[in-house]
Amino acid sequence: MEEALIKRIMPNSLEAEQSVVGSMIMSKDAIVTASEMLLKEDFYHQQYGVKFETMVELYTEGHPVDLDTLQNRLKEKDVPQEIKSLDFVRTLVTSVPTSANIKYYANIVKENAIKRKLIHVTEEIENECYAGKESLESVLDKSEHDVFELLS
């Protein structure tokens, strides 16, 4: 049987990522909640990871987090112009009806990040199996370790 090459998109939710960042602009509590649940790397779309990281930095440094402080800090960073755009940041705030659902949005982002990591782990396992350089026991031990590491 011939293997078909299928272009697959890694698990992600643009809407959840937008909602996390929009909620963080609206509420300090949302910043705390999101920063306890997520890392910059959990965001599939770079622009939201950058905004997430920037708001956490501002909050940690004791600065207010609002449209102006976020845009000013983004201007200091070497990021693409569209990420620095005030219109882009404003759109995030208007697209989120309430920050009360931050845990729900953050959980979606986290679950998709774990799924992407699991895909990478299984690709490594597959490559080790095809290479045939390691014993089955060694491959199984490493596989078990790598999968359980995703849970921590």
Question: Model segments located where?
Answer:
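Noncatalytic partner-interaction/assembly domains of nucleic-acid and motor enzyme complexes
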Residues: 1-112
